[in-house]
Structures are given as structure tokens and as C-alpha cells.
Amino acid sequence: MNFSDLNIENKLKKSIELAEFKVPTPIQSQSIPISLEGKDVLGTAQTGTGKTLAFTIPMINKLLKDKQAMALIICPTRELATQVMETVLKLNNREIGIGNALLIGGESMQKQLRQLKKRARIIVGTPGRINDHIERKSLNLSKVNYLVLDETDRMLDMGFTPQIELILKFVPKKHQTLLFSATLPENILKISHKYLD
């Protein structure tokens, strides 16, 4: 499979080409076609295997097709959230132009509020800061129909389960979930039964 073979919007194909992504990695060729069908995904992938692109391509395709839809990507650390946003921005170029917001601790709240006011439809962040914005009523997740839990094993190890569950109360029941984890211990399998269809 090549990226050009994917059944995606032409704008996005062009954007992948411009970003010089050529041949899909195993995680990309396995998960992208499933995600594009709107199905939930449980993916095992280490950092550096191209998993970010594996969820970014179907996400942008979905948001291009549905102008009301939103995507939420939850990451365990601000460093990972920043890296994820860098990949998102490589594809979400000026031509595509979907509003986005990076919600992480240690960064200016004002800047984040400005990003959210500009009708951000791609939200990348850490559980703590996402919950801060929910409490402040600056983040409305009622249109989220694409949810990514990235490095889920790390999030559980760091004790984020209650925070994630709190966030998910604000996400509509009907949404697509992609759960990525480096390993698949018992607790991940449990959480996948809970969150995935």
C-alpha cells in the first residue's frame, strides 16, 4: 500500500506528498484503512514507528468531510503532545486549514484560550490541562467524534485513569476511538473493552 492508494480527500493526498511521507510503516498500513472505515482501533506501537501519522491521516480526512466534527488527542506528557501537534501541522497545512489547539501545562493559558476561540477542531493535550479547560468552560467537547488515546499504557502508569474518565463524560457516546499503546498489559485490555466497539 502507498499513501496515494488511500481512499482519502485529494487535498490530504497532496498534503502527504508535500510533507514527503512516502511509504507507510507497518502500523500505518495496518491501521489507516480500518480507521478510514470509521472503526475503532487498538494499536500496539512503540514511539518512532509512525503511529502519530497512523491516526492523523484518518482524523484530517474525517474533519475535511464533516465540517462540524472535532478530534481530541490525549497524550501522557506535554513533550509527546507537542510532538504530536508537530506531525498534525505537517499535514494540516494552509490549504487544509483546520483550526487546532495544543492544551498542555506550563504554557500560556491566554494563548490556548485564543486558539480555542478560533474554533479549534483538532485538540491535542494532556489530561490535566484538558480538564482545566473543561472546568473553565473554554473547551466544549460535544462535537468530538474522533478520539485518540496515545501511549495509553504510560497514561495508566502515571495514574491518569480518573482524569481520562472525567474527560470522556463530556465526549458524545457515538465517536470513533483509537487507542495506542507500546504494550498490551491486562489493564490496557480492560480499558480497551470499556472504550472500544
Predicted regions and their residues:
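Conserved pre-motif I regulatory segment
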Residues: 1-44, 150
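Walker A/P-loop NTP-binding motif
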Residues: 29-41, 51-66, 82, 86-92, ...
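The conserved Walker
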Residues: 45-49
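Post-DEXD/H (motif II) to motif III coupling segment of the RecA-like Helicase ATP-binding lobe
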Residues: 85, 140-197
